[in-house]
Design a protein with these regions (language model features):
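Extracellular regions of mammalian proteins, primarily the fibronectin type-III
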Residues: 101-103, 115-126, 138, 161-163, ...
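Active-site-proximal beta-strand/loop segments in catalytic clefts of secreted hydrolases
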Residues: 107-110, 120-122, 128-131, 144-147, ...
Length: 326
């Protein structure tokens, strides 16, 4: 470059109106913003995210049609997912071994336990959309590597603030359809023995007929107290037709949901957002997210979960800026 030449940086001032939706989907407010943009941003999607900042929180990230056709490209990294810390064993609503499932996280809101979550990458956790509805992002904290909420002596837990809330745009607060969300951690976590990511399931693969494991800090009985120690329970996963034949109204159970549970073996209040896991060889995959149900362990009312395999493309699209372990 000649000495008298200067590097040209294109500067564009953008003045835009940001429409803020209310809880019922109507426009609640209009905010005017002016942004300065240079040509140093790497692509249009990144540029737009940098401009708006909370656009993911407001719009739920990428919307998608049937089976999430808008496929993204995630970066595969030299790391492993789904590695538990102890051998599998059959349990029923009993405490787990310390950090047996190192991807299990808990969401704390305004200093209090709120929901469960699962670590997907070094800077994203997966949870239920209803868990983050109407929450102020600044008050959300994600705790990883924890086992017993009442003490800090058993495990070196890590706490992270949240920089973005990505809720599925089609989430229906009445039916709980598309009950899925991502939280981006403000600071990535380092993978250790006690903090590791979970594997995503194979798209289109039905886990029906398998035994799943629900992990979380939810109540062990309906109306009971929240436990300090993370719990696990094994539940049979039903087919869609089996679930629709139960006591739920058949139309309430969509293809984006799956059911699991039998008798007293069920997820309960407080488990929301946590994982339903199945083994795949020597690894675990998250096939469901605790979503909704009637009571806890009531006959004829199995727990209902978000079917994660339906959202692989949605997840890939929204995880383009991070590494997904395999």
């Amino acid at each position: 470059m000649a000495a008298n030449q200067r590097k040209i940086v294109h500067v564009l001032w953008i003045s835009c109106l940001l429409l803020l939706p209310s809880a019922k989907g109507h426009i609640a407010a209009v905010k005017k913003n002016r942004f300065q943009v240079t040509n140093t941003t790497r692509n249009g999607k990144f540029l737009f995210n940098q401009l708006v900042g909370l656009t993911s929180f407001l719009t739920g990230g990428n919307d998608s049609s049937e089976d999430d056709d808008d496929e993204g490209k995630t970066r595969n990294c030299t790391c492993e997912c789904g590695q538990s810390n102890q051998e599998n064993r059959i349990v029923g609503g009993r405490p787990t071994g310390i950090n047996r499932y190192p991807w299990v996280a808990r969401i704390v809101y305004d200093g209090h336990f709120h929901c469960g979550a699962s670590l997907l990458t070094e800077d994203y956790v997966l949870t239920a959309a209803h868990c983050v509805r109407r929450l102020k992002r600044s008050k959300i904290r994600v705790i990883l590597g924890d086992h017993d909420q009442s003490t800090t002596e058993d495990t070196p837990a890590k706490m992270r603030a949240v920089s973005a809330v990505i809720r599925h745009r089609n989430f229906d607060q009445e039916s709980y359809n598309h009950d899925i969300a991502l939280l981006k951690l403000r600071k990535p976590v380092e993978f250790t023995k006690n903090i590791r990511p979970i594997c995503l399931p194979t798209s289109g693969k039905d886990p029906a007929g398998k035994t799943g494991t629900v992990v979380g800090w939810g109540r062990t009985t309906e109306g009971g107290m929240l436990p300090n120690v993370v719990q696990e329970v094994q539940v049979p996963i039903l087919t869609l037709s089996q679930c629709r034949a139960m006591k739920y109204r058949a139309s309430r159970i969509t293809s984006y949901m799956l059911c699991a549970g039998r008798g007293a073996m069920d997820s309960c209040q407080g488990d929301s957002g946590g994982p339903l896991l199945v083994p795949n060889g020597d690894k675990f995959e998250i096939v469901g997210i605790v979503s909704w149900g009637v009571g806890c362990g009531r006959p004829g009312y199995p727990g209902v979960y978000t079917r994660v395999s339906k959202y692989i493309n949605w997840l890939k699209y929204n995880l383009e800026d991070t590494c997904v372990c395999s």
